[in-house]
């Protein structure tokens, strides 16, 4: 079983994530999706003065048209452009899923756990690396027998080399935990249907039927999740949809949202 491997990876992530978190606490939040360089004090004061005047101007005059959110400058929350398109989400023709950016809420004071972890009763780890991530979540709840939805985007700020390693390790740990689903939920049976180094699709059968997709976009230190499930036999049949199409739809927005991160 790979449960021990997942735990070892998680333990390794703890030190890495703590270092990343402490480094970010020491940064002024002039974040450009990279480590901030050192600036002379005069330049900092001049920049603050100009920024203050610019802010006052922007507050006084309404914007004609808002620019799409990207990182930078929007790096302390999930950019609106990072979410999967509603039209690419399975069952959209039946459920008319909401626009993800408009329905997303920030995940704070809680670990942004993946949807399968609740179904599989995956144990929580102390000092989870995801605690250091900027995260947003969309949840659509329906009655039993109807498909429900969870979408999440997690982003680690700072140096993308280090953040990318964290994203890749969290992804690997998640895949191992999903494969070990029956350790916590014997009645649930996982099956990985697309197994790639940084992309995964799986079906979990049992009392809860679940389809889950997970992408680690290492070059932007970001993970995107899409999970749909039905508690009890679903009244709407699952459509024929290629795993790769959904995974591609999760990946593409990250390249646009996090400027400077190659596909």
Language model: regions and residue ranges:
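N-terminal "mature-domain start" segment
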Residues: 66-137, 259, 263
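Short Gly/Thr-rich strand-loop-strand
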Residues: 96-106, 110-111, 168-211
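A short, solvent-exposed beta-edge/loop patch
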Residues: 185-263
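Low-complexity, intrinsically disordered or signal/transmembrane-proximal segments
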Residues: 10, 29-31
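A short acidic-to-branched-hydrophobic micro-motif
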Residues: 133-165
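Methionine residue identity
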Residues: 1, 22-25, 36
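Secretory targeting and sorting signals
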Residues: 18-19, 31-66
């Amino acid at each position: 079983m790979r449960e021990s491997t997942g735990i070892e990876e998680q333990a390794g992530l703890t030190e890495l994530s703590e270092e990343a978190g402490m480094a970010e606490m020491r940064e002024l939040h002039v974040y450009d999706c990279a480590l901030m360089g050192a600036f002379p004090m005069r330049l900092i004061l001049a920049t603050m003065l100009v920024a203050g005047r610019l802010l006052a101007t922007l507050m006084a005059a309404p914007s004609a048209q808002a620019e799409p959110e990207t990182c930078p400058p929007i790096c302390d929350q999930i950019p609106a452009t990072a979410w999967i398109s509603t039209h690419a989400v399975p069952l959209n023709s039946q459920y008319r899923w909401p626009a993800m950016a408009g329905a997303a809420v920030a995940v704070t004071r809680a670990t942004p756990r993946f949807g399968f972890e609740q179904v599989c009763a995956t144990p929580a780890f102390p000092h989870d690396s995801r605690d250091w991530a900027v995260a947003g979540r969309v949840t659509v709840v329906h009655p039993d027998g109807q498909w429900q939805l969870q979408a999440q985007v997690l982003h680690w700020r700072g140096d993308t080399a280090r953040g990318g390693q964290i994203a890749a390790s969290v992804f690997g740990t998640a895949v191992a935990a999903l494969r070990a689903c029956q350790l916590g939920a014997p009645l649930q049976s996982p099956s990985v249907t697309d197994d790639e180094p940084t992309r995964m699709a799986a079906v979990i059968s049992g009392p809860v039927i679940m389809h889950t997709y997970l992408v680690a976009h290492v070059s932007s230190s970001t993970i995107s999740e899409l999970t749909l499930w039905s508690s009890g036999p679903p009244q709407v049949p699952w459509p024929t949809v290629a795993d790769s199409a959904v995974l591609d739809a999760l990946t593409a927005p990250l390249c646009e949202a996090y400027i400077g991160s190659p596909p």
